[in-house]
């Protein structure tokens, strides 16, 4: 009888990724975690629209954290984002891809009207 350690299965991909530009210098991302077993999330960004761009990892968050702020964006630029869950077995498939255009510098989002 052999003693084999089994690796966990790959985590499920995050869903419902959204992106909101805040002024010209930040993009806020939020998503929904699907299932357990992940050790965190990897955030990827590409310049331009859709998955035609080359995605690069720009950051990560721990398990059960479902938001990220990208403070390294430039004004008046289009970015695409996607998120992967990960664990000891590897990365999940990517989330949906979202695109966001940052406004010109100094532009603030509209205030909520009460």
Task: Give a label for each model feature.
Residues 1-37, 75, 88-114:
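Pro/Thr/Ser/Gly-rich low-complexity, intrinsically disordered linker/stalk tracts
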Residues 41-76, 88-94:
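Recognizes extended acidic, P/S/T-rich segments that occur
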């Amino acid at each position: 009888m052999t003693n084999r350690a089994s690796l966990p299965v790959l985590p499920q991909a995050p869903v419902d990724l959204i992106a909101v530009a805040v002024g010209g210098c930040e993009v806020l991302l939020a998503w929904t975690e699907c299932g357990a077993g992940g050790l965190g999330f990897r955030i990827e960004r590409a310049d331009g629209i859709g998955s035609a761009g080359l995605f690069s990892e720009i950051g990560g968050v721990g398990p059960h954290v479902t938001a990220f702020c990208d403070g390294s964006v430039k004004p008046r630029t289009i970015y695409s984002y996607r998120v992967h869950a990960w664990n000891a077995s590897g990365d999940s498939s990517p989330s949906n891809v979202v695109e966001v255009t940052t406004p010109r510098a100094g532009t603030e989002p509209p205030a909520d009207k009460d």
